[in-house]
C-alpha cells in the first residue's frame, strides 16, 4: 500500500472552540495588559500558580476579550467564514505524547491520512492554545513545546 499524505482542509470548524459568553474575571494587577501585549508581539505566555488560582478562567477571559472577528479563507472553495478567537484547551497528563499535540498519520480506506493535533490546529487558525497542567506531561512531550 502506497503512503500518501492527505492534508486537512485549510478551514477548520472553530466555532466549537470559541468562547461565546464573557467569563467572569476580576483583574488583580496588570495581567490583562501584559497578556494583550504578549499576544500582539506573538510571545508565548506561561501562567504558573496553584490549582484553583484562576489560570484557566483568565485564559478563557482573554480568548473572549481578544475575540474580534477573524477571517478564514478556504483554499478549496474560496468561501470566507467569520469566527471569534478560538481557544483550544489541552489537558496534559503523563501519557500525553508529542503526536497527541502535533498530529499523526492514520490509516483509512484510501491509505494513510495526516490528522492535525490540537497544537497544529491552533497554529493554523491563529487560536490560543492552552496547555492545562503542562507540568504533568512527559519530558519528551515538553521538549516539543
Where do the protein language model's features map onto the residues?
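AAA+ P-loop NTPase catalytic core and its hallmark functional loops
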Residues: 1-145
